[in-house]
């Protein structure tokens, strides 16, 4: 489900997305999109996922969320029935006792801390589950709601396939905005001039084309309405005119125009497996990576579903490596001459080889389709031996670097590190990913997050890991960082860890390597599902 927008404005700390004539604004709240009009008396609408049950016609998940809201003292947030329990109600459960709708604004991420609710949604009673409902694709000026939220374990980075019966993508005509949201949007349109229709000077609410997949089109027009109340002059309030449904026929809001597109492929679907993991096939995928992913036009024989998948893969490449390849990642020491797309393919191969979440099978299908479309006189057996050696070296070094930083983090948790008078500055990226590595390391060695740890000790661990990440990301070998840590600790443990991991092979799964893959998956998907949302500092364009 896609919502095009023309400009963005940061107002009261929240990003608002305006349509072309600035007659309507969208904002994100608890994984849902809320649309408000400039025109007095216009329609307010909410677009997003509602929770259902574990099978067709079942509403057990919705009932559970409503009962938990009542139990935790958030009766004011309980929806009137089981048909309109939106994802933002789920977000409220993990947002703290005093949380209101205003606290949920600005992100498509919804935290699920309740293992019972997680069991309903992904069939596993996990904690620290995050549901990613959509993404802001800034380079296309589009907000996208996924057909089904993506479920990620924030502790280890694992992705789960949610129960599709648990979610439906719908829209609802809102009768009012909650009080906290009324305060948020008050005065929003005052600083943004309306652009009138140049042909007839009309200031009517323009149509917004909302693009949905065929699956979503079946449910997106589900419309929740309530009884009539008197009309008032207060915008966005509970006295907003309420429109009674006059028949069983579902009608859309007057600003909505639905356009249907083919269903977008889930490139991370674990049921879609690669047909081979031979190095020669990998080399072919790496060789054609940029043409396959970045080529603007479809080539003959490319299926629509695969063509749509290219856009999703491109977005993931940008999330991991940046628009111009400016974001560092593992494997840089040997992969300097490879493009971001080529290094991305290698990462997907490693994840696929170790049966973690990946999109290598889709890349394989795209490569096969592209090669089949080449002229018959083209020499497709053109992968140089130097490139094959570079691919092998990059894959092995990438897994070894990830393995070393992971085992180092696990070891540092039990070592008494000397305190430093001051800390050198490390990059924001290394700090953020250092925290993620340490969180996963604690889980790996059986340390609970509830065990109290001195803040200075935690900061010390985070500093060492983030500093070492900066060293690796700059292209320095693991060995140099291990030697520095040996001097710092007065111990040979870091160099011993280095020699334990240096023999790892990315092409032959082994027991210790599975722990390394957990770290790789956590860091990779941490970027894929966070970077596209930006840094929250958007300004009007």
UniProtKB/Swiss-Prot annotation:
Stored InterPro entries: Herpes_UL21
Gene Ontology CC terms, in alphabetical order: host cell cytoplasm; host cell nucleus; viral tegument
Which UniProt keywords are given for this protein, alphabetically ordered? Host cytoplasm, Host nucleus, Virion, Virion tegument
Keyword Methyltransferase included in the entry's annotation? no
Q: Where in the cell is it found?
A: Virion tegument; Host cytoplasm; Host nucleus
**Chief place where the protein resides:** virion
On the tree of life, the source organism's domain of life is Viruses
According to the record's subunit comment, the protein's assembly and interactions are: Interacts (via C-terminus) with UL16.
The record's comment on protein family reads: Belongs to the alphaherpesvirinae UL21 protein family.
Its annotated function is as follows: May participate in DNA packaging/capsid maturation events. Promotes efficient incorporation of tegument proteins UL46, UL49, and US3 homologs into virions. May also play a role in capsid transport to the trans-Golgi network (TGN).
Q: What is this protein called?
A: Tegument protein UL21 homolog
């Amino acid at each position: 489900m896609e919502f095009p927008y023309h400009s963005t404005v940061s107002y009261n700390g929240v990003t608002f997305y305006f349509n072309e004539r600035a007659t309507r604004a969208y904002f994100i709240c608890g994984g849902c999109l809320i649309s408000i009009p400039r025109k007095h008396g216009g329609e307010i609408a909410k677009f997003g996922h509602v929770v259902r049950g574990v099978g067709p016609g079942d509403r057990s998940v919705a009932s559970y969320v409503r009962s938990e809201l009542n139990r935790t003292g958030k009766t004011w947030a309980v929806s009137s029935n089981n048909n309109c329990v939106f994802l933002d109600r789920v977000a409220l459960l993990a947002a703290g006792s005093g949380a209101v709708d205003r606290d949920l604004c600005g992100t498509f991420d919804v935290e699920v801390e309740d293992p019972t609710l997680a069991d309903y949604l992904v069939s596993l009673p996990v904690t620290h589950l995050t549901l990613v409902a959509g993404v802001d694709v800034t380079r296309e000026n589009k907000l996208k709601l996924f057909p089904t939220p993506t479920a990620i374990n924030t502790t280890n980075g694992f992705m789960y396939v949610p129960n599709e019966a648990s979610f439906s993508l719908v829209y609802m005509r809102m009768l009012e905005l909650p009080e906290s949201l009324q305060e948020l949007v008050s005065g929003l349109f005052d600083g943004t001039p309306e652009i009138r229709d140049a042909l007839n000077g009309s200031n009517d609410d323009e149509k917004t084309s909302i693009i949905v997949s065929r699956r979503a089109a079946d449910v997106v027009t589900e419309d929740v309405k309530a009884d009539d109340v008197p009309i008032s002059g207060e915008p966005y309030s509970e006295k907003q005119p309420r429109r009674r449904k006059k028949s069983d026929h579902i009608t859309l809001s007057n600003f909505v125009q639905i356009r249907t597109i083919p269903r977008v492929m889930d490139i991370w679907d674990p049921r879609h497996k690669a047909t081979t993991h031979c190095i020669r096939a990998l080399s072919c995928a790496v060789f054609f990576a940029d043409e396959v992913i970045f080529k603007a036009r479809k080539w003959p024989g490319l299926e629509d579903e695969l063509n749509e998948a290219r856009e999703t893969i491109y977005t993931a490449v940008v999330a991991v490596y940046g628009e111009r390849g400016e974001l560092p990642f593992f494997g840089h020491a040997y992969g300097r001459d490879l493009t971001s797309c080529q290094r991305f393919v290698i990462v997907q191969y490693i994840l696929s080889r170790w049966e973690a979440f990946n999109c290598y099978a889709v890349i394989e299908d795209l490569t096969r389709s592209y090669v089949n479309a080449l002229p018959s006189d083209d020499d497709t057996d053109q992968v140089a031996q130097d490139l094959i050696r570079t691919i092998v070296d990059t894959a092995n070094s990438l897994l070894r670097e990830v393995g070393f930083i992971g085992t180092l983090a696990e070891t540092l948790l039990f070592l008494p590190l000397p305190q430093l008078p001051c800390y050198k500055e490390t990059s924001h990226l290394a700090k953020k990913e250092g925290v993620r590595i340490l969180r996963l390391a604690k889980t790996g060695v059986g340390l609970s997050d509830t065990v109290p740890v001195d803040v200075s000790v935690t900061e010390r661990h985070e500093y060492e890991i983030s500093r070492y990440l900066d060293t690796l990301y700059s292209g320095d070998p693991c060995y140099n960082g291990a030697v520095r840590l040996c001097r710092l600790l007065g111990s040979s443990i870091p160099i011993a860890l280095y020699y334990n991991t240096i023999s790892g092979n990315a092409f032959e799964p082994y027991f210790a390597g599975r722990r390394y893959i957990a770290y790789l998956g956590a860091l990779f998907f941490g970027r894929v599902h966070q970077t596209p949302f930006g840094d929250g500092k958007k300004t009007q364009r």
